[in-house]
């Protein structure tokens, strides 16, 4: 029996964890980037009977007024991800919040984790997918897993998690105490198979 799988990507978290796990300094900014569709297919392929029905990418968006170069790069990357996605990839972005002393302090995402958590819970609770795979190491998202377990109890759980797994390093995967949630631990070979090394700052 096929299972509809939707993958939820906390994109900046996925990116930075990939860099930490698999990219030796000095690494270019493109190292750590992933192709959402390729990653979604990889994960859905590890669910018994899994059929990928969506990849939802949540990320911050640089301000055009404050950082036009990064804003343009983000737009190019988003367009390519959606264009490659065959109708399966959706990118949801919110403008970054800039501190008064930017760029000495970096801009930060605002509201991305909340948007991801709400969509994750609602889509699974409404049975819009059979399996929702959450790829993030942000512990602020643990309550979303807890909510899914309460709203759609069962074994196996309707929610699963994913994380990068570097040799000899404990993976930063999310968990809920006392609950059995399947973990997809992705190796460096997995990362290389879905990596996107495009330099989106280039206009050519």
Identify the role of each PLM range.
Residues 88-204:
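Nuclease catalytic cores that cleave nucleic-acid phosphodiester bonds
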